[in-house]
Curated annotation (Swiss-Prot):
Protein source organism: Shewanella baltica (strain OS185)
Pathway participation: Phospholipid metabolism; phosphatidylethanolamine biosynthesis; phosphatidylethanolamine from CDP-diacylglycerol: step 2/2
Molecular functions (GO terms): phosphatidylserine decarboxylase activity
Purpose of the protein: Catalyzes the formation of phosphatidylethanolamine (PtdEtn) from phosphatidylserine (PtdSer).
Protein name: Phosphatidylserine decarboxylase proenzyme
Stated family: Belongs to the phosphatidylserine decarboxylase family. PSD-B subfamily. Prokaryotic type I sub-subfamily.
Length: 292
């Protein structure tokens, strides 16, 4: 059955399907929208007591429901200066060192950090010998993405690609999954060197958004696009630790890349398949801070 599911993913018109779902999710259909939201809550056992608006009727569209805010204080932020926090609610897929420009995806599968970053060689070089972490956001999860540490945006790259599902089954069976799906790469300058936040698209993900650019995709592009940003002066975009940096409409994956020597150790309990909650301790930082 697993082989059939994977084969279907290769055959389906994934972009067309995703855009169709996106249009439906954006529709404000009154009682029909409310019914769909109620079904989704029941199907995925979503705890609406955490949401700022807990009643399904409060959401005019499915997208509004899916990108719902949480109640203030529901995800306390670890403010220890030597701690990096989880950027999302989800589950760790994999994490570890970047070796010879390769990132571990699943047993028998690695992929290139250069390809992940849209073939931006200078960017890939900055993360050689560093660490990575891949976090999967299931449909039930809170889908806003936050900063693990304070950073100033220096570059954003849109990379066109496939829209395979990014669930654990697909990660185990589709080679180079995260480096072949459509994605948005945001690079920040931090006290510990560069930080890459890679927002990976997936089947029926209606859009990828950032707080500084709004909706980046759709529309789907056919070539790599890059935007550069000032890191100093009044136009610099600096986001604090825990501040929202983007969001998905429907579930997907975030891949983080860290500079060499940025991370001392991952926090206790942070390992493959571990559940993550935004704001909790993710990693212990090196004592010696540097600028790239």
């Amino acid at each position: 059955m697993d082989k059939v599911k994977i084969a279907l993913q290769y055959m389906l018109p994934k972009h067309l399907l995703s855009r169709l779902v996106g249009k439906l999710a954006a529709a404000e259909a009154g009682a029909l929208t409310t019914a769909a939201i109620k079904w989704f809550i029941k199907q995925y056992k979503i705890d609406m007591s955490e949401a700022a608006q807990s009643e399904p009727e409060a959401y005019k569209s499915f997208n509004a429901f899916f990108t719902r805010a949480l109640k203030p204080g529901i995800r306390p932020l670890d403010m220890d200066a030597d701690i990096m926090v989880h950027p999302v609610d989800g589950a760790v897929s994999q994490l570890g060192p970047i070796k010879n420009g390769r990132i571990f995806q699943a047993k028998g599968h690695h992929y290139s950090s250069l390809t992940l970053l849209g073939d931006q060689a200078e960017d890939a070089k900055r993360f050689e010998g560093g660490d990575f972490a891949t976090i999967y956001l299931a449909p039930k999860d809170y889908h806003r993405i936050h900063m693990p540490i304070k950073g100033t945006l220096s570059k954003m790259t849109y990379v066109p690609g496939e829209l395979f599902s990014v669930n654990p089954l697909t990660a185990r069976n589709v080679p180079g999954l995260f480096a072949r799906n459509e994605r948005v790469v945001a690079i920040f300058e931090t006290e510990l060197g560069p930080l890459a936040m890679v927002l990976v698209g997936a089947t029926i993900v209606a859009s990828i958004e950032t707080v500084w650019a709004g909706t980046v995709t759709p529309p789907t592009g056919k070539q790599v696009f890059t935007w550069e940003y000032p890191t100093q002066g009044p136009d610099a975009i600096t986001l604090d630790k825990g501040e929202e940096m983007g969001r998905f409409k429907l579930g997907s994956t975030v891949v983080m890349l860290f500079a060499k020597d940025a991370i001392a150790t991952f926090a206790e309990g942070v390992e493959a398949e571990a559940v993550t909650r935004m704001g909790q301790a993710f990693a212990n930082l090196k004592d010696v801070k540097h600028a790239d």
